């Protein structure tokens, strides 16, 4: 019996007992249909306390891949920061105090929603109050969400921030996350957000609520709000402090590097000295003091396989590449010994509903090449269900599922010939619930379970569990010892 194992993560494809507004159900998916009839599977948890998040908090790709790759429940940053605010210890954080005290003015940049995937509005509000109490002027640079929450609810969150605004706390700029939180090297987008924050360019005469209302009338919703600054804000000045409030790293790497990377050269930047701090480490190659350093787990799945002298391949397209590498490996950037990586570029389109197959064919091809080369362990992420699900376009999400299903069919056929075990699961759901009961478009992740198929002659039954049970399941299939840090397998 072969020990070679393939772990497939179909991002954003979850279980929904209702067929209504369910792109996964609607899609023509012969591979999944075959699996449901012939391969053992169970439903596993991806959210809340099962993955180290607050109770009933939706899961996300960072947390999901960290949990899958480490094989245990990790206390997530959202929970750590919530507790620091609740216990009134955030104000005592040395990095935060030092950054505020040595800066002239404080600029807070963060995603202003309670989605809890990249940030939380309460963190921004708490830091604004702390900086004000330390005698500083505070400028808040709002990034609107529309993706991890409803597409047009920004005013709800902005009103919460307006409640704390006074002579010392001001909303300075606004930008949709499409611009400020790009992660695909679309520097033209990032520049628009950067210019509004740094140079107060452009500037609108509207107040923030009127600006949003005008955007809505023009069919521009929260994710895509055009960056602008507001009256009374004139830009960043020498010796100001910038605090990046998002705790998730992947969508803060670009915008933070523009400010903090000495040799950044994609476009013209502010030349004066500035002070920086970030909630977590975004990029080890760009020095920014960190409020909440990560505790990297030991004996991750990648490490155990490497220590056994076996080969492994991690592959995904750009949008999810960090997840199968950095996050999957427990927050470690460098590959382990005998780990190879294949990055497939994501298509250069404005939004992925325009190309719902994304780069799935190329990703699938990379997997099949690795299988033909008899790589001992392969992990792959298919991004379509999540990235197209986030657009809210139902028909495109259906096509996204169909594109993934086609690639799965080819992979499973080859698995039979090459004697691979396969675990097929997801990090969280999305496209299986595209509207709520009132008919409102949903673009966020779902709070629910996902499928976990285990295709192997060794397996007749799959237990229920959570994402933390995946890594030990891989190791059991590969006939490797499960380290004491990991939880129980599903088989």
Curated annotation (Swiss-Prot):
One annotated Gene Ontology cellular component of this protein: cytosol
Cofactor requirements of the protein: Mn(2+)
Pathway(s) of this molecule: Carbohydrate degradation; glycolysis; pyruvate from D-glyceraldehyde 3-phosphate: step 3/5
One Gene Ontology biological process: glycolytic process
Domain of life, per lineage: Bacteria
Binding site for substrate: 118, 147-148, 177, 183, 248-251, 320
Residues binding Mn(2+) 1: 386, 390, 445
Entry GO MF terms: manganese ion binding; phosphoglycerate mutase activity
Annotated keywords: Glycolysis, Isomerase, Manganese, Metal-binding
Catalytic activity from the UniProt record: (2R)-2-phosphoglycerate = (2R)-3-phosphoglycerate
Binding site for Mn(2+) 2: 11, 61, 427-428
CDD domains: iPGM
Summary of the function given for this chain in its UniProt record: Catalyzes the interconversion of 2-phosphoglycerate and 3-phosphoglycerate.
Protein name (database record): 2,3-bisphosphoglycerate-independent phosphoglycerate mutase
Gene: gpmI
